From Swiss-Prot:
A GO BP annotation: indole alkaloid biosynthetic process
Subunit structure, interactors included: Homodimer.
E.C. code: 2.1.1.261
Protein name per UniProt: 4-dimethylallyltryptophan N-methyltransferase easF
Family: Belongs to the methyltransferase superfamily.
GO molecular function: methyltransferase activity
Gene3D superfamilies, alphabetized: Vaccinia Virus protein VP39 (3.40.50.150)
Catalytic activity: 4-(3-methylbut-2-enyl)-L-tryptophan + S-adenosyl-L-methionine = 4-(3-methylbut-2-enyl)-L-abrine + S-adenosyl-L-homocysteine + H(+)
Amino acid sequence: MGNTNPPHILDIRRSKFEESIPKQVEAGLLSSPKTLPALLFYSTEGIQHWNRHSHAPDFYPRHEEIQILKEQATDMAASIADGSVVVDLGSASLDKVIHLLEALEAAQKKVTYYALDLSFSELTSTLQAIPTEQFIHVQFSALHGTFEDGLHWLKETPVIQDQPHCLLLFGLTIGNFSRPNAAAFLRNIASQALTGSPSQSSILLTLDSCKVPTKVTRAYTAEGVVPFALESLRYANTLFPQDGEERVFDPHDWHFLSEWNYILGRHEASLIPQSRDIKLGSPLDRIVVAKHEKIRFGCSYKYDCGERKELFESAGLHDVKIWSKEGCDVAFYQLKCCPN
């Protein structure tokens, strides 16, 4: 008989991240070049828009990840130690990870899968979509918080400290960081989550090697991306104190810009004014965004072989296993701490 009890959601937030976003928005808009923080894009509605965008036919990263998982999840499951705590750092795409979970169940691996997300409602819907009654060996739970909250929880929770840990970073998550910050983030994961049982603990992540501008820009301008981008402005308006009818942003004043940066090997997503200089609403009314000025909100770095090697070495990690498929630019990498 499978799991019958509904999975439990643990609130591991050490502070409410929503409270810090307005300060991050203001700081980003006062910097040069102007930016918006990533947290602004992960409201419940923002995540739903992203999921619709990532399911578009031209959005190759998701389709390639699923192809590889369908064909090679059994081998991936074999690489995860029995008794592991599996933490999915960003659990919005259940349709991907379900292939790995089913392979772990088939292998009779006694693991606990924790979905981590910023959105409580998205966590709830993710867990409700898992057919838990079909699983006996795999247990399910969830963590409500940020990446940092999740790593702190792994390190400081006595009952799981010394168990093997497997951190999932699907969806090209690591590509959203600058190259130095990506290495620092992986190094932080290693120091907080892989040290309790280092020989059996690992990170399982995806990276994209595609540097063909037409393929990349077609993917990142696929259906659904404009509502995703503009939803961030609506969400921002809810986080700032209201002054009558005035709002900080009017989403109708902005449009989405997609560019490939040849020098840095990354896709860049920005919002720019539609037709004129824009003075923001109170309390950011001292900020003016010029007509052709970009507010960058996202980058997706692509990694060739040399850049991957440098990333892993800088993080103090080495790849022990690679899962790829002919014709796919996305691949899965299992990383472990370098032996001392």
